[in-house]
Structures are given as structure tokens and as C-alpha cells.
């Protein structure tokens, strides 16, 4: 088993050694799989006023043993985040080459919202699969391989990471947020004919083919991007999977940004994109 751990994860040699040690059935149960050579995951990270968190988040993203294109979009941060990012970008120029991680940095000249930052990141992304990653440490990048498995195995075009499935650890927080999320997800399901448990999740993973179909049509600037993406994925009848994820939610004192106005906007977007493109 120790020999298996010394190999590069998700390579044919790594998988063959684990299959020999654990058996094929156990490997499937554990979600172990082979990633094709030269395959790249684009990680789109919208950032706004996260000077105390983005570095920890980026360290976690970089540590995931996958070849990644990390697209960081600063949405005109005013707390020093932009200065930190630009310094980090400059340091990368003289740092040793990182075989696992390539970086792109995009800076908005005015604050436009998460949806606008995600759309900018989508335009810059060039990987085989794209995932959205918030910069606030609520979602755990170590779960990328689990989320990617249905796509790599050819079963799914899109994967949603659900905070309400399975037995992954969750921080217990606001009841009314939970209730609002369930209401919005249920209403979205009524319009899309999907049976999601967490439409508002940050973790939406999609193939390049899906991205090329829906990205040019996205319009929302703020948190309405979540129901808009969901509606357009459903309209194109892409194969959608849901996977359980952990969640460590923040309080408003810790920097949580979504508010009740965004809930009403999400309601509008569910109806709007449920009825027309």
C-alpha cells in the first residue's frame, strides 16, 4: 500500500497498484479513478474582500493532486485583497515552475458581483472541466476528485456538490437560510424538472462542452448566477449528478455576503430563466 501512495495520484500506474491491493470493487466504492493524460481542471475563483482567507484557500486548491488552471477574478476588492493578489502574481514570476498549477489573474475595475466574476472566469478558463470555487473557506477543495468522478467516468456532464446529501460534516448555522435555500431549490426544480437538493451550491462542475454552450448566454451579475446556470443546464438536457460535500459556513461577522435581497433576486431569476432563455 505504501508503494501506491508514493505514485502520482490518478495515473494508470497508481490505479493499477491500488486495484491490486484493494480490489476493483473497493476502488469503485472509494471513488478511485484514472484521469486521462494532459487533462486539466480549471478552477474559477471569484474574490471580493477576502484578504484574511484567499491565501489559505489557494493553498488548499494548490494541494489537490490534479493538473489545474487556477483563474482568480478579483471583483474590485477594497480591503487590500487586490494588493495581496498582485504581489503574489509578481512573486510567481520568479518562483520555480509548478507542474500542477498554472495561474491566471483578472481584475475588475469596479465591483460587479459574484455572477460577473464567475462569467469573467468562464471566459478565461481553458481546461477540460471547470469548477467554481468561492474564496471564503466554506467549501473544501480536497473534495474535487469525488466531484469529478462522474464526469471522468462518462456518466455526467455536470455535477452539483450538495450540502444537504450524505453524512459529510456541516457547520450548523442559520435556520432561515436553510429554509430559504430549500424553498428556492424546490421552486427551481419545479421549473427545470430536476430533483436537486442544493441549487444554490457554489460547487458546480461542468465539462468544457457544457461551458461553451451556456457561458455565452449568462447574464446575471450577482448571486442570481446560481439559478441561471441551473436553468440553462436543464434546458440543454445535460446529464446532471449530485454528490454530497462538506460545508463550513461563515457568519456575517466572519464576512458572509449573501443577504435577503439576493434571495428575492434568486426568486426572480428562477421564474425568468424557467420560462425563457
For the regions a protein language model found, what residue spans apply to each?
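Short aromatic/hydrophobic "clamp" motif used to bind/position activated sugar donors
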Residues: 130
Amino acid at each position: 500500500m505504501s508503494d501506491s501512495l508514493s505514485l502520482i495520484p490518478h495515473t494508470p500506474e497508481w490505479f493499477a497498484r491500488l486495484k491490486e491491493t484493494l480490489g476493483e470493487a473497493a476502488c469503485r466504492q472509494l471513488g478511485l479513478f484514472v484521469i486521462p493524460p494532459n487533462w486539466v481542471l480549471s478552477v474559477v475563483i471569484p474574490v471580493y474582500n477576502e484578504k484574511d482567507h484567499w491565501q489559505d484557500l489557494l493553498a488548499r486548491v494548490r494541494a489537490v493532486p490534479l493538473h489545474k488552471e487556477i483563474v482568480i477574478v478579483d471583483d474590485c476588492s477594497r480591503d487590500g485583497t487586490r494588493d495581496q493578489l498582485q504581489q503574489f502574481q509578481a512573486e510567481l514570476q520568479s518562483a520555480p515552475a509548478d507542474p500542477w498549477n498554472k495561474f491566471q489573474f483578472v481584475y475588475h475595475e469596479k465591483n460587479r458581483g459574484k455572477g460577473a466574476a464567475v462569467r469573467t472566469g468562464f471566459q478565461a478558463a481553458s481546461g477540460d472541466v471547470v469548477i467554481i470555487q468561492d474564496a471564503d473557506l466554506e467549501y473544501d477543495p480536497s473534495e474535487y476528485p469525488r466531484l469529478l468522478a462522474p464526469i471522468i467516468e462518462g456518466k455526467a456532464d455536470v455535477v452539483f456538490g450538495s450540502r444537504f446529501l450524505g453524512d459529510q460534516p456541516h457547520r450548523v448555522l442559520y435556520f432561515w437560510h436553510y429554509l430559504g435555500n430549500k424553498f428556492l431549490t424546490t421552486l427551481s426544480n419545479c421549473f427545470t424538472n430536476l430533483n436537486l437538493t442544493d441549487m444554490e451550491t457554489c460547487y458546480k462542475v461542468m465539462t468544457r462542452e457544457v461551458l461553451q454552450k451556456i457561458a455565452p448566454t449568462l447574464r446575471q451579475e450577482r448571486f442570481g448566477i446560481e439559478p441561471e446556470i441551473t436553468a440553462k443546464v436543464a434546458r440543454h438536457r445535460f446529464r446532471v449528478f449530485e454528490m454530497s460535500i462538506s460545508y463550513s459556513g461563515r457568519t456575517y461577522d466572519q464576512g458572509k455576503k449573501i443577504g435577503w435581497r439576493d434571495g428575492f433576486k434568486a426568486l426572480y431569476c428562477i421564474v425568468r430563466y424557467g420560462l425563457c432563455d
